[in-house]
Curated annotation (Swiss-Prot):
Intervals of motif GPALPP motif 2: 32-37
Record's compositionally biased regions (Acidic residues): 60-69, 142-152
Motif (GPALPP motif 3): 91-96
Protein name (Swiss-Prot/TrEMBL): GPALPP motifs-containing protein 1
Positions bearing N-acetylalanine: A2
Biased composition (Basic and acidic residues): 123-132, 169-193, 233-267, 293-308
Cross-link (Glycyl lysine isopeptide (Lys-Gly) (interchain with G-Cter in SUMO2)): K277, K314
Span(s) of short sequence motif GPALPP motif 1: 7-12
GPALPP motif 4, short sequence motif: residues: 111-116
Organism of this sequence: Mus musculus
Keywords: Acetylation, Isopeptide bond, Phosphoprotein, Ubl conjugation
Database matches in Pfam families: DUF3752
Pro residues: bias regions: 106-115
Length: 346
């Protein structure tokens, strides 16, 4: 299995190691740089891994036998340490001076630090690598324990078994409705009524909103009796008696205003004297003319009249009907300039 080598021959120990590596190499051609033998043993199939493990065990036995052989043993031990350190990394190996020490402090963590309960030294497996499964399981257990201590937002779950039934809910609802109906029947026998002062306006405010829509020009001292809002039953009886007495006194005054027999007799004498001795007054002549004119207008035949804009469209707010009503109202002068009801003659 030895190949023809150009140059000085290697020592016996290195030659055997080289032959073992040649056996482990894949006979198929590879384009590009070849991976180290240890990486190939990790990425190959189970059969290759078994062969690699057997070859590594043989190399270990040979190295143990040649521990006392001088520089060869040191070189082999150094190569084995380099292979163990470089396992899991791609690319060129670091020089021996840059090798990470076993007792070196942990690398600084960038970002917020975990609570003290979450910090745990990572465990290593048989090959010297960190086992992420154990660390993740530890974190999951810690998170579960810490989650129980956190404040719970929202309704708390029931502490005991919940006994809910649709039938019982319907029965309770029917019972509440029955009680409501029975109580309503009892209350109907006693109707609730409001007092009169809550539903009726005071006498002074009966015509509220029907009066003039202007402000008062003068101060009104007679603001009205507002004691109706606070009257007791005794006050109402007292006021009712006062109103009856006031009505009686008012009726007595009306009786006094009635014309006496003397005034009536004198009025008849004056009217007979005026008819016989005096001529007809201007007021009487005016009334007679109005009556005759009204009779003529009534008997007059109505004819078709031409279109009048003011009358037909009622442009002017003061139309003919309002004009006639105003004239008719001004004719009744006797209501303003007539004699009084009592004491007609001195």
């Amino acid at each position: 299995m030895a190949r023809d080598l150009i140059g000085p021959a290697l020592p016996p120990g290195f030659k055997e190691h080289a032959t073992v590596e040649d056996e482990e190499r894949d006979p198929s051609p590879v384009a590009g740089p070849a991976l180290p033998p240890n990486y190939r043993s990790c990425s190959s199939d189970s059969s290759d891994s078994d062969e690699d493990s057997s070859s590594l065990s043989e190399e270990g036995n040979q190295e143990s036998e040649e521990e006392d052989t001088g520089p060869n043993a040191k070189k082999q031990r150094r190569n084995q340490d380099d292979d163990d350190d470089d396992d899991g990394f791609f690319g060129p190996a670091l020089p021996p001076g840059f090798k990470k020490q076993d007792d070196s402090p942990p690398r600084p963590i960038i970002g917020p630090a975990l609570p003290p309960g979450f910090i745990k030294s990572p465990q290593k497996n048989d090959k010297g690598r960190e086992d992420p499964g154990q660390v993740s399981s530890f974190f999951n257990s810690e998170e579960a324990e810490s989650g129980e201590d956190e404040d719970i937002v929202g309704p708390m779950p029931a502490k005991g078994p919940v006994n809910y039934s649709v039938t019982t809910e319907f029965e309770k609802r029917a019972q509440r409705m029955k009680e409501k109906l029975t109580k309503g029947d009892d209350d109907s026998s006693k109707p609730i009524t409001r007092e009169s002062w809550m539903t009726e306006l005071p006498p002074e405010m009966k015509e509220f909103g029907l009066g003039p829509r202007t402000f008062k020009r003068r101060a009104d001292d007679k603001s009205g009796d507002r004691s109706v809002w606070t009257d007791t039953p005794a006050d109402r009886e007292r006021k009712a008696k006062e109103i009856q007495e006031a009505r009686k006194s008012f009726s007595k005054k009306d009786e006094e205003n009635i014309l006496s027999g003397r005034d009536k007799r004198l009025a008849e004498q004056v009217s007979s004297y005026n008819e016989s001795k005096r001529s007809e007054s201007l007021m009487d002549i005016h009334h007679k003319k109005l009556k005759s004119k009204a009779a003529e207008d009534k008997n007059k035949h109505q004819e078709r009249i031409p279109f009048d804009r003011d009358k037909d469209l009622k442009v002017n707010r003061f139309d003919e009907a309002q004009k006639k009503a105003l004239i008719k109202k001004s004719r009744e002068l006797n209501t303003r300039f007539s004699h009084g009801k009592g004491n007609m003659f001195l």
